């Protein structure tokens, strides 16, 4: 069986709360870093989440 192309990534809040989401992304089709606006429950607002590597 072939190994999947999708790699696990972590989306870290830019509000500095330490909150993060985990997701997967296809590195072959989207080599740039992912930035999404998502809800941060710590500050109770929609903030920018930036891609970081899962350690």
Swiss-Prot record:
Gene transcribed to yield this protein: rpmG
Tell me the protein family, please: Belongs to the bacterial ribosomal protein bL33 family.
Protein's UniProt keywords contain Ribosomal protein:
yes
Q: Which organism is it from?
A: Pectobacterium atrosepticum (strain SCRI 1043 / ATCC BAA-672) (Erwinia carotovora subsp. atroseptica)
InterPro entries assigned to the protein according to its UniProt record, in alphabetical order = Ribosomal_bL33, Ribosomal_bL33_CS, Ribosomal_bL33_sf, Ribosomal_zn-bd
What are this entry's molecular-function GO terms? Answer: structural constituent of ribosome
Q: Which GO terms describe its biological process?
A: translation
Q: Gene3D superfamilies recorded for this chain?
A: Ribosomal protein L33
- What cellular component GO annotations does this protein have? cytosolic large ribosomal subunit
In terms of superkingdom, the source organism counts as: Bacteria
The name on file for this protein is Large ribosomal subunit protein bL33
Q: Which UniProt keywords apply?
A: Ribonucleoprotein, Ribosomal protein
